[in-house]
Amino acid sequence: VKRGVPVIRPEARELLKTQLLLKKPKRVLEIGTAVGYSSIYMTGFLSEDAQITTLELSEERTAEARTNIKQLGKETQIQVICGDAAETLKELPDDTYEFAFVDAAKAQYIYYLPDVLRVLKPGGVIVSDNILQEGEVLESHFLVEKRNRTIHDRMREYLYVLTHDDRLETAILPVGDGMAISIVQE
C-alpha cells in the first residue's frame, strides 16, 4: 500500500507480467487505475505501440495517475478515463482489447464481466486480482462479518461465473490475495 492507496502485490505483479509476455497484447483494458502503478508497470512488458485504457472512479486518483503517467513519459501509451467503470465500459467498442486486468471495487467485478467479455476479442485474457479476499471468499456467508457479506457473496458469484461460463477457461490461483486467469474461447 502506497500512502493508503492499494497497489498490486509483488507476487501478483509477477504473474501479471508473465501473462502479458505470453499474450503480447496491443490493446489492454485495466479496471481500477488507482494512482497508475499497474498501468505504468504493464507498459514495461508491452510493445511501444501497445495501448492501455484504464478506468478509475475517483477524480483525485485519476488526477494523480495522470500526473504519474506524464512524469514517466507514458501519456501516449496510457489513456485514463474517469468515471464509474460500470458506465464507462458500456461506451467502449466491441472486440477491441486482447487483455483485461480487473483490480477495482471487488463487489463490482460481477457487474463488469458482461462488458469485459463484450470488449475483449476472442482469445482475450482476463486477469482478476484480489479474488480470495484474504481467504474470506472460501468461508461460509454466515462466518463473514456482516459488513463484508455483500463483497463476499458477489465475489463468490463472480468466481462461479468465471469457472462455469462456457465462453471462458479459468484458473484460480492462490497468488497474492488470489488471482483468476480467464481465457475467452474463440
Each predicted region: which residue ranges?
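Rossmann-like AdoMet
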Residues: 1-7
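S-adenosylmethionine/decaboxylated-SAM
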Residues: 10-186
